[in-house]
């Protein structure tokens, strides 16, 4: 029957809250899991299930299986064609190749130009990942776009979903966590698979920080490049699980060390017809400042927090450092990478780095480096990787995962 508000209500229903006991616990890896295998549950927005699922809205129902494992089965990457070398930068700011390479390890970076777009790079990377995974766009259940620099204020994931041809209209949304974004994307994908019944999740890390750089500031313009990287995370049997554990954190107090804030509006007072003053209304169109960074503080933060985070993730996974085949860090600065590897006692030959060729590509750096390592044959099926992202927020997170 309809109530006064016009909504339909049911007759009184006994309160079952006190009878519901959900057998869920938090595992050592940080994921929520069931204490026992749950029954098959159909998730749908439709109230009734038609016997002929192929001819009714219930065809979009998806089985929810808990617990479930998840694994990485494909990767891809894309970079703009425009290459800017250290020598090129020396023509516009007071710097040189030796100064940049010594302090950062960076030699070149790629920058968007002309008709390049972040969505275009993301689609290219995602297409390559899908091809490697042998998954068609129609079978993607979720698109996660990890970026701080979308082409559209309201996000880029739905545009990517459309461009890829995901005809079943899967959920697509952005994750904003700066250079930690991709790791948080992996965690989000795993949570959706383990608890939401999703099978194939596309995780993309892509950023174009060159659009927010002050190209007259040699302290920041030398660091950043543009790129996109993607992986396909797929549901699997729990015994084949390939994402063993994670460790994630934020510290808002550290925002002062790395940020790109909204510029303050400068409004003239406006008087209405009755003489009242509107003051700052209506606001003028806002924009973001260029990236502001205290490099020394960011370095201290990274070399302290990242090793602790990786050690915590290893402990949750029940693995010693010796079980890790590769250390894959966010490609921010070679000094940071070397310092973290030293503190964790990882030899240089087990550390993945492509920073020299691309610079700091923010959320794209980890999947970009992973894709190159996989396609070059360095990372092989069955290899275990410790990865960690860290950056603005401040945010940082680590994951222990197995490739395929």
Swiss-Prot record:
EC number assigned by the record: 2.3.1.180
Compartment list: Plastid, Chloroplast
Pfam families given in the database record: ACP_syn_III, ACP_syn_III_C
Molecular-function annotations in GO: 3-oxoacyl-[acyl-carrier-protein] synthase activity; beta-ketoacyl-acyl-carrier-protein synthase III activity
Predominant place of localization: plastid
UniProt record, GO biological process: fatty acid biosynthetic process
Protein name, per record: Beta-ketoacyl-[acyl-carrier-protein] synthase III, chloroplastic
Lineage of origin: Eukaryota, Viridiplantae, Streptophyta, Embryophyta, Tracheophyta
């Amino acid at each position: 029957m309809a109530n006064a508000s016009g909504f339909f209500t049911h007759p009184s229903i006994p309160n079952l809250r006190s009878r519901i006991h959900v057998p869920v616990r938090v595992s050592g890896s940080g994921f929520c899991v069931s204490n026992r295998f749950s029954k098959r549950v159909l998730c749908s927005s439709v109230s009734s299930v038609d016997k002929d699922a192929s001819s009714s809205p219930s065809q979009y129902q998806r089985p929810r299986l808990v617990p479930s494992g998840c694994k990485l089965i494909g990767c891809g990457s894309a970079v703009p064609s425009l290459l800017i070398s250290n020598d090129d930068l020396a023509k516009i700011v007071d710097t040189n190749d030796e100064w940049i390479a010594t302090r950062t390890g960076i030699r070149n970076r790629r920058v968007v130009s002309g008709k390049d777009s972040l969505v275009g790079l993301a689609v290219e990377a995602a297409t390559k990942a899908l091809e490697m995974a042998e998954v068609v766009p129609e079978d993607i259940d979720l698109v996660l776009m990890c970026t701080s620099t979308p082409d559209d204020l309201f996000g880029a994931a739905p545009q990517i979903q459309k461009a890829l041809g995901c005809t079943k209209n899967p959920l697509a949304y952005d994750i904003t966590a700066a250079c930690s974004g991709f790791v948080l994307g992996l965690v989000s994908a795993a949570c959706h698979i383990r608890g939401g019944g999703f099978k194939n999740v596309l995780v993309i890390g892509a950023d174009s920080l060159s659009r927010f750089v002050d190209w007259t500031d040699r302290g920041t313009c030398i660091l950043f490049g543009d790129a996109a990287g993607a992986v396909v995370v797929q549901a699997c049997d729990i015994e084949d699980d390939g994402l063993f554990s994670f460790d994630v954190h934020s510290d808002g107090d550290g925002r002062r060390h790395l940020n790109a804030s909204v510029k303050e509006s400068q409004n003239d007072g406006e008087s209405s017809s009755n003489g009242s003053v509107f003051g700052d209304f209506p606001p003028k169109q806002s924009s973001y400042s260029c990236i502001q960074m205290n490099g020394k503080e960011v370095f201290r933060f990274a070399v302290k927090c990242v090793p602790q985070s990786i050690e915590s993730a290893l402990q949750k996974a029940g693995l010693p450092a010796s079980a890790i085949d590769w250390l894959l860090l966010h490609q921010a600065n070679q000094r940071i990478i070397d310092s973290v590897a030293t503190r964790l006692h990882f030899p240089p030959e087990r550390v993945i780095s492509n920073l020299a060729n691309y610079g700091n590509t923010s959320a794209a750096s980890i999947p970009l480096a992973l894709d190159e390592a996989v396609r070059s044959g360095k990372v092989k099926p069955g290899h275990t990787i410790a990865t960690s992202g860290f950056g603005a927020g401040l945010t940082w997170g680590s994951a222990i995962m197995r490739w395929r």
